Amino acid sequence: MEKKRLSKKKLVLIIVACVIISIPTIILPVSTVVVYESIFSMRFHTEEYLLFSPSEFEGLVAERSEFESNSTLTGYKYSKEGMTPKGVVVIAHGLGDGGHNKYMPYIDKFTDYGYYVFGYDAQGTDESDKKAPEGFPQSIKDLDSAIDHVQSINEYKSLPIMLFGHSFGAYSVGNVLNHHPEVECAVMVAGFNESESMLGQYPRKVLGFLVDGVLLPYVSLYERIKFGKEYSKITAVDGMEMTDAEILIVHSQNDKRVPIEYGYEIYYEEFKDDERFHFIKYEDQGHIDMLYSQNAISYRAQLENSYQAYLSEAGKRDKDKVREEYMSKNINKKLYFEPNEELFEKIINLYNSSVLE
């Protein structure tokens, strides 16, 4: 009887030991992969009613130009006839609502001021391949490949390169400087420093120190396996330290999507005394409003109110097809995306001064 009790205790101890061992070796790694892949499992496209055609902008010429990253990405070379180019602006778009098309009003203005523009759709967005972006570090690789492609184009070869990125795109702009320190100027709007800490922001609110001490090391390991050390183990701070480029960093204090402490505050603490760095901090522009004029912001609210009134009067529900039909008939896209002239002027002045130095 005593031997049976001992063998039962041994069995329990073995089971407990197996469970304890399986947590760090099986359960957490597998859970990390499943959750990570679920976060980056969606393909993003621009709604039809928001898509611009180059023909909507006087004199704007667009030429399709594909290149390879992990997959085939689609970009466009933008210019205006007869222009004498000062440089080429490469645009890295944000994540969640399609590719680079929504920046067309900015693209048009950059060409008006003498800059070629190369805009591309990152992996898993709009006209580019793959079912999903797959992870933040992939955006660095996409931008790295885009710059390599730009430098291989004959009319771009001798031109200085300027970067412009928002959110996910701003993260890739800062980080890609690790691979392209030759960039002359970089503008980063509402970006973040590194993938790992950004991915931990929401679970950190619930689990606290467990996220940094227990979960994020698995995220770091998985990203290193998936994307390689050259894209997963770098930060925007590292990149900015490697270059002599002029840098403009823009953020809003009330940004909830990319909290200011994940980007701007890190950069300000590190580079506030460096004359190469220029900082603009808004208080109430959220994650995206700083890109657009006050007229655009007011118009967006007005358009949404009109749409909600239409739903109420027609007795309809807010569905994709209903919104598409209404917006297609009523939206003024140029007003909806009208650039913030004050911010644009600061960007173009910085580009111009970088080219003249």
Language model feature labels by segment:
Residues 13-15, 20-67, 74-78, 304, ...:
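An N-terminal hydrophobic leader/cap segment in hydrolases
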Residues 95-108, 122, 261:
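The serine-hydrolase catalytic nucleophile loop
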Residues 110-129:
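Conserved alpha/beta-hydrolase
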Residues 133-154:
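Alpha/beta-hydrolase active-site loop
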Residues 175-229:
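Hydrolase active-site cap/lid region
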Residues 242-243, 249-251, 255:
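Short beta-strand/loop motif that positions the catalytic acidic residue
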Residues 245, 259-269, 294-295:
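Short alpha-helix in the alpha/beta-hydrolase fold that links the catalytic acid
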Residues 274-357:
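C-terminal catalytic histidine-bearing segment of alpha/beta-hydrolase fold enzymes
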